[in-house]
Amino acid sequence: MRHCDSFCELIPMKGCEAMLEWMIDQGAGREPADIVLKGGRFLDLITGELVESDIAICEDRIVGTFGTYRGKHEIDVSGRIVVPGFIDTHLHIASSQVTPHEFDRCVLPQGVTTAICDPHEIANVLGAEGIRFFLDSALETVMDIRVQLSSCVPATHMETSGAELLIDDLLPFADHPKVIGLAEFMNFPGVLAKDPECMAKLRAFQGRHIDGHAPLLRGLDLNGYIAAGIRTEHEATNAEEALEKLRKGMYVLVREGSVSKDLKALMPIITERHAQFLALCTDDRNPLDIADQGHLDYLIRTAIAGGVEPLAIYRAASVSAARVFGLFDRGLVAPGQRADLVVVDSLEGCHAEIVLSAGRVVSEALFAARKPVAEVGRNSVKAPRVTASNFRSQSNSGKTRAIGIVPGKIITQNLEFDLKVGPNGVEPDLERDVVKVAVIERHGKNGNIATGFVHGFGLKAGAIASTVSHDSHNICVVGASDEDIATAANRLGEIEGGFVVVRDGKVLAEMPLPIAGLMSTEPYETVREALRKLRHAAEDLGSVLEEPFLQLAFIALPVIPHLKITDRGLVDVDKFEFVGN
C-alpha cells in the first residue's frame, strides 16, 4: 500500500457549525476541496460503469463526482480504480488473536474500512467488562468498528463460561454510539422453544438489527426463527440452504474465514440479482492468513476468479452490506457518502494501494495518533493442574463415539469407532487417525474435565492445546498421549492462556494470549510469525489441517452440528443433549 502521511497531517479540522456550508461550496466547485483524487476511474455500484472522474472530499465526506475539481491536496490515481471501502459484516476480532487496535492496523490497509464485530469471545470470559473494552477501543480506532451486543453468553447451558449476560446486563450498552443491535442469536432451539431469557432479549431489540446463527435450520422452524425479528445469516454452507434463507427474507452474509470456508459453495448465488441481499464476512480470520492471502480483498478476487461478476461482489462488499445494517452514510462513491475509499490496481486484482477512512489517508502516523485502551482480563486462566491420569478413560467398551473433523468447516461428524481397551482404558488409534480430545474448565468455577476422541487431525505424536475454544473458551487439547495432553494444558495456565504445541513433554512452540486468554499484547506482525511457528510445529506432529488451532477452537462449540465436546461432556447437537462415549 502507498502511504501519504502528509495529507492527513496537514488538513485542519473545521468547526462543525460551518461544515455544511463548506461541503456545499466544495461540492459545487466554488471552493477547492480538501482532497481530490484525480486521474483515475471509480466503480459506480448503481450502474456498474467505470467512470472517469475526479473525486472531491470535504472533511470525512465525498462531496463531488462526475466532474473536475481543484483540491488543496491532490492525489494522482491515474491508471487505478477507486471503489467504496469494504465492510466486514460479521467477525470476532478476538479470533484474530490481536486487540482491536492491532486489528485496525492489520486490516484497514487491506481496504476494510468498517467492521461489525461481536465481542462474544471476551464477553464469555469477562462479561460486561469485555464488551466495555471493545466499545472503548472502537471509539479510538481509525477504521469504523461497530459492535453487536453478544446475545448468547453463555451460548448454551451445556458448558461452563466465565460470565453470563442477561438482558439487564446488555441494556446499559444499547444506546452506545457504536452499537448497532444484537449479535448472532446462536441459541436457535431457545428461540423456537420461547425460552424466557431469549424472549426478553428479542423483545428488547425489536426494530433494531438482530443477527442470526442457524446452521442447517430449514422449513417451518426457520420461519419461526425469522419471525422473531432475526435478519441475517452467516452459517449457510451451501447454495440451496442460502437460497431458502434469501427467499424467506434473510440477508445472507457470505463467509470465508480461516476455518469456515463457504465462499466457493455460495458462489452460485452471488449474482447481480441477489447482490442487494448479500454481504461478506470473515467470522474468524487470523493474521497469518490475512498476511498470506488477504482479508475481504481476498474474498473479492477469489470470487471474481471463480466466475462471479465484479459488480455483484463489490456490491456485496460495500453498499449492500451498509444497507443491511442501516449504515446509509456509506457504501457508494457518491456525494454525501462517508469518504471510505480504496484505490485498487484493478477490479480483478483488488490490491489496495491507497485507503481513505473518513477522508483520512491511512498511514502509520494515523495509527500512532490513537489513544491506547487499558488492558483487561489478565490472569484469567484458573484451571486446575492436571496429570495424565485425568484423561484416562474408564470405559470397558471399545465402541466409542468420535468427533469427525470436516476440513474447512466447523460442522463435525458424529462417528463411531471400535477402539482397543488397554490398562488405562480406551486407547487412541493413530493408524486410523483417532486421538484424544479433552476440555478443561478454566474460569475457576468447577474444575470440570471431559474427555473424548476425535478423528481427522492427523496427529502421530504430542498434543496441541488452546484457550481459544468457542464459545466459553475453556482449555481444549487434542493429543496422542495423556502425558503430553497434561503438559500442554498445564503450560497454558503458566502463560495466561494461548496456544501450545508439545511433544514428549517438551514445548515445541507457544504463543501467550494474556488478554482474557484470547488476545496478544504484541503487534500483529509478532502474532503472525508466532502463528507460523505454531502451524509448522503442529505439522511436525502430523497435523494435516490447514488451520489446526482454529479447527481445534470449534470442537467445543455446542451450537454447531453434529457432535461436540464441552467441559461437561460429549454433546449431540442435533438432539441438544449429552451423550456417552
From Swiss-Prot:
Cofactor(s) required for function per UniProt: Mn(2+)
EC number assigned by the record: 3.5.4.2
Leading EC class: hydrolase
Catalysed reactions, as listed in the record: adenine + H2O + H(+) = hypoxanthine + NH4(+)
Single GO BP term: adenine catabolic process
Keywords: Hydrolase, Manganese
Bridged cysteine pairs (disulfide): none
Any GO molecular function: adenine deaminase activity
SUPFAM superfamilies: Composite domain of metallo-dependent hydrolases, Metallo-dependent hydrolases
HAMAP family tied to this protein: Adenine_deamin
UniProt record similarity statement: Belongs to the metallo-dependent hydrolases superfamily. Adenine deaminase family.
Protein's recorded name: Adenine deaminase
Annotated source species: Brucella abortus (strain 2308)
